[in-house]
Each structure stands twice: as structure tokens, then as C-alpha cells.
């Protein structure tokens, strides 16, 4: 089989393996995103790349429990395994249903709220204060999201393939995957009602959620850029620059051609830049 999925190509390159990452590639079964109603990419490869990006950030263990981030990586896109997302992604946004899964899953108690908050808000992490202050959950609660369910067969395929690629990555993932398997057919009802009552005031939980949201956004976007070769090209161009680090950081923060959220992803490359 010739690899046509850029995420799979990058995963194969990063793992330094001579075969396809999965035994059988089925993008229609496990797409990493849907564009114009067409399933695209590979969710398993995306998760694998997120885990590899985590391995590349050495400072993580000094600021937050690595297993907590691994849990966030494995669960933040669970909403993409629902029937609703596959059929109508805009009506069933994956981050909302992923957060709802975390809140409703049986067997998940420790760090439930940190994981749910970071999953719900990780796309907007760089505006977390404004988002949380203006009651993002109230806004979400006002939208008439429907009821949907995880598709058990797709969940099992996801688990099997993630386990397979993790043989090379070697992360501690079995506990989270067992949780997912035990809730493989979970029905996700009335997210608006559930989120309306979801309010966390414990400062310790909020602080962890903020850090987790930042890291999840960073890892998610660094991995997602490989879908269209965008990140690899930008990273290569980035490394060619000979500016001093402070000059480079200033350019990243002030260049109007770089989207606000993407600036943080580029700043995360500075440690690699300094090693060159």
C-alpha cells in the first residue's frame, strides 16, 4: 500500500519503521478531521504524533504529571468516534462531546475536571481567562446539541491501532485505553444541560486545567500541521534563520502574518532552534 496520508507518512518517518504504521489503513473508519463532509487524515496517526511531540518536550515533567497529559492526548478527540461527528461534525463538535465523555465515563474520577476543562477549551487556550470569565459553558449550554453515542467498533479499532503504534513510542497508555474500552458504547446525552451545571471554582483544579490546556493545544497543533506538510515546511524555514533568539521571538510575536494561536506553536520551537 502506498501511503497517501501525510500524518501516516510523518509517523512512519519519525518512528523509523520500514512498514506502514497500521496493518490496514482505513481513513474512512478513523479520520482525524472531516472537510466538506469528506473524512480525511488518520486519527490514530494524529494521536501518535501528539505522543511523539510530548516526548520531545523535556520540561513537561517539571510542571505537570506526564500521565495526565497522556490522558488528555488520548481523550481529547474521543468525540470524533461518535456517530454524530461522523455524520454532522458542525452539529456535534468533537471537543464538546469529548469533554462530555470525560465527565460521564465510568471509572474516571481522578483529574476528571482538569481533563474535561482542558479538552473543552484547548482550542482557545491562549484566551482562557476571557473564555472562562465569560462563562463559555453557559454559551455552550444554550446551543441545542443533540444526543449521540460512541460507535463501539470504531472505538475498538482506535484502541487496537494506538496500542500497535505505541509499541515503538512506549508511553504509559494502557490505563486510559482500558477506560475507553469500558465505555466504548457510551451514550452522550444533552451536553448543554450537563455543561450548564459544570462549574469548577477550585483554584488548584483550574490552575492544572490552564497548564494542561496550553500543552494540549501545543501538542495537538504541532501534530495537526503535518496533515498538509505545513508544519514541516515552516519548521525547516524557521531553523534556517540566523537571528538571535530574542529577535526571533519578537518577530514571532509581532508578525501580523502569523495567526495568534500559531505564534505559541512557533515559540515552542525555540529550544530546538537553540540546539541547531
Regions found by a protein language model. Give the residues of each.
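Acidic/His-rich, divalent-metal-binding segments that scaffold phosphate/diphosphate chemistry
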Residues: 1-90
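Divalent-cation-assisted or electrostatically stabilized phosphate/pyrophosphate-binding catalytic cores
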Residues: 7-10, 15, 35-42, 86-105, ...
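Divalent metal-dependent catalytic cores for phosphoryl transfer on phosphate-bearing substrates
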Residues: 31-36, 59-238
Amino acid at each position: 500500500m502506498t501511503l497517501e496520508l501525510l500524518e501516516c507518512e510523518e509517523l512512519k518517518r519519525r518512528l523509523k519503521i520500514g512498514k506502514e504504521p497500521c496493518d490496514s489503513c482505513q481513513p474512512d473508519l478513523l479520520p482525524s478531521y472531516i472537510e466538506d463532509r469528506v473524512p480525511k487524515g488518520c486519527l490514530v496517526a494524529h494521536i501518535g504524533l501528539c505522543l511523539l511531540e510530548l516526548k520531545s518536550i523535556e520540561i513537561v515533567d517539571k510542571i505537570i504529571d506526564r500521565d495526565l497529559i497522556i490522558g488528555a492526548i488520548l481523550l481529547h478527540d474521543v468525540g470524533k468516534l461518535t456517530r454524530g461527528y461522523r455524520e454532522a461534525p458542525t452539529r456535534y463538535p468533537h471537543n464538546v462531546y469529548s469533554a462530555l465523555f470525560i465527565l460521564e465515563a465510568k471509572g474516571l474520577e481522578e483529574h476528571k475536571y482538569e481533563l474535561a476543562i482542558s479538552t473543552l477549551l484547548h482550542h482557545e487556550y491562549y484566551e482562557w481567562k476571557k473564555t472562562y470569565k465569560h462563562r463559555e459553558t453557559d454559551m455552550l449550554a444554550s446551543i441545542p446539541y443533540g444526543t449521540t453515542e460512541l460507535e463501539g467498533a470504531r472505538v475498538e479499532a482506535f484502541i487496537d491501532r494506538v496500542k500497535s503504534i505505541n509499541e515503538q513510542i512506549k508511553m504509559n497508555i494502557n490505563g486510559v485505553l482500558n477506560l475507553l474500552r469500558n465505555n466504548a458504547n457510551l451514550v452522550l446525552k444533552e451536553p448543554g444541560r450537563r455543561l450548564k451545571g459544570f462549574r469548577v471554582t477550585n483554584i488548584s483544579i483550574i490552575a492544572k486545567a490552564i497548564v494542561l490546556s496550553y500543552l494540549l493545544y501545543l501538542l495537538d497543533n504541532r501534530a495537526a500541521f503535518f496533515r498538509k506538510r505545513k508544519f514541516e515546511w515552516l519548521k525547516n524555514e524557521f531553523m534556517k534563520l540566523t537571528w538571535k533568539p530574542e529577535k526571533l521571538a519578537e518577530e514571532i510575536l509581532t508578525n501580523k502574518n502569523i495567526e495568534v494561536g500559531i505564534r505559541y506553536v512557533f515559540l515552542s520551537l525555540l529550544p530546538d532552534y537553540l540546539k541547531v
